[in-house]
């Protein structure tokens, strides 16, 4: 009797891709991965070990280990300092001390590609500021935002709707979230983050050497995410699913902790300031309209108030489904 092989998350080499020379087959490869898995690993491993550089400019070179080292003193700050990380937007501020998720602690930096956004966060955490932290986080956010923009443009081009990309790009805002998962004690749950889909357009996740992230396939398999060196997990969120008229898959994912090491993770989450519309080109006889136009941050608020927030349930369909 044979055994079915467990599927693997696609890995796509991105190191040599520039927005000006992206070819059709590469665009289709990215689109197909997001349609079938809802995610893929963007591999930039042509660079030196531990160093990521998506441009020709020195300031965009990032040493990932240095980024994670900078998170440790941040999370070591007193709780009364960390809770100053607030926002009127749902899931944009401090999250922690939750009885049903005792291992997780997280903070959000809004408008993370701008000096003002990062400075506002840093000044709230450190009374005298923290210039080194500021520079590192903003550089990281800028680098990953370029990856996000490239991926988004590739999908738009693959669907033949690239004419909408520039106007969409003008409405993008980036939230950077830093996350810390402590190892569980003997009697605690190993669940660091419950199964959920992201409410974003696109999410891009990295982690330190401690594993734990799992992604659920359409067939119900939980796949452990194995990051190649110098790679990013690119994941579609519910807003991307709706924009694509249900072509792109928004996958469930979770964190399950093992061992006795702390896990640090960074996510860049893309939101749209305004109304998201399904392109008319993506509506036809084979793909009847499944979603109405919707306000992205309105959807985030809707989800935050949904009593079914912790269930595997299509929240975006409830919000704006036809």
What is the role of each PLM region?
Residues 1-322:
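Peripheral, non-catalytic segments flanking oxidoreductase cores
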């Amino acid at each position: 009797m044979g055994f079915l092989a467990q599927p693997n998350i696609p890995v796509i080499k991105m190191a040599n891709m520039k927005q000006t020379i992206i070819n059709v087959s590469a665009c289709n490869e990215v689109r197909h991965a997001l349609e079938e898995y809802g995610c893929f690993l963007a591999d930039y491993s042509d660079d030196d070990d531990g160093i990521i550089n998506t441009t020709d400019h020195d300031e965009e070179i990032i040493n990932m280990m240095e980024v994670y080292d900078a998170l440790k003193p941040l999370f070591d700050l007193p709780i009364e300092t960390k809770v100053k990380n607030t926002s009127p937007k749902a899931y944009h501020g401090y999250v922690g001390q939750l009885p049903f998720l005792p291992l997780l602690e997280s903070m959000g930096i809004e408008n993370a590609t701008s000096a003002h956004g990062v400075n506002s966060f840093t000044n709230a955490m450190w009374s005298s500021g923290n210039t080194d932290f500021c520079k590192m986080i903003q550089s990281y956010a800028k680098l990953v935002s370029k990856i996000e923009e490239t991926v988004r443009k590739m999908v738009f081009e693959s669907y033949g709707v690239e004419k909408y990309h520039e106007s969409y790009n003008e409405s993008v805002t980036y939230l950077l979230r830093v996350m810390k998962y402590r190892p569980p004690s003997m009697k605690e749950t190993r669940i660091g983050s419950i199964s959920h889909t992201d409410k974003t357009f696109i999410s891009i996740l990295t982690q330190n050497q401690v594993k734990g992230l799992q992604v659920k396939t359409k067939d119900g398999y939980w796949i452990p995410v194995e990051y190649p060196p110098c790679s990013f997990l690119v994941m579609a969120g519910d807003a991307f699913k709706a924009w694509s008229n249900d072509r792109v898959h928004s996958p469930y994912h979770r964190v399950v902790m093992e061992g006795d090491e702390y896990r640090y993770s960074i996510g860049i989450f893309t939101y749209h300031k305004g109304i998201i519309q399904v392109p008319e080109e993506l509506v036809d006889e084979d793909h009847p309209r499944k979603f109405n136009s919707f306000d992205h941050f309105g959807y985030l608020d809707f989800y935050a108030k949904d009593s079914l927030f912790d269930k595997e349930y299509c929240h975006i369909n409830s919000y704006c489904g036809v």
